[in-house]
Curated annotation (Swiss-Prot):
Subunit and partners: Part of the 50S ribosomal subunit.
Protein name as it appears in the record: Large ribosomal subunit protein bL31B
Keywords carried by this UniProt record: Ribonucleoprotein, Ribosomal protein
GO biological processes: translation
GO terms, molecular function: structural constituent of ribosome
Organism (species): Borrelia garinii subsp. bavariensis (strain ATCC BAA-2496 / DSM 23469 / PBi)
């Protein structure tokens, strides 16, 4: 592999802005802001708006839209006679 072509991959902490959950993972992102993680080491901190810990799809708290009512209304309106 050529040197200097690939981005630097390092450990960073991603923090969910809505509920405070934190994940330690590898990323090419970097930040000047740091945080001390549960293992006692300091890592760059990336704050994100939403993660799998707070997204309604993954938490099971999603709301289903009444699509059936809309489909029936559409079919009634544009039904071929």
């Amino acid at each position: 592999m050529r040197k200097g072509v690939h981005p630097k991959n390092n450990l960073v902490v991603f923090k969910d802005g809505s509920n405070g959950a934190m994940f330690l993972t590898r990323s090419t992102l970097n930040s000047k802001e740091t945080i001390k993680y549960t293992d006692g080491k300091e890592y760059p901190l990336i704050t994100v708006e939403i993660t799998s810990r707070s997204h309604p799809f993954y938490t099971g708290q999603q709301k289903f839209v009444d699509a059936a009512g809309r489909i029936d209304k559409f079919n009634k309106r544009y039904k071929k006679s």
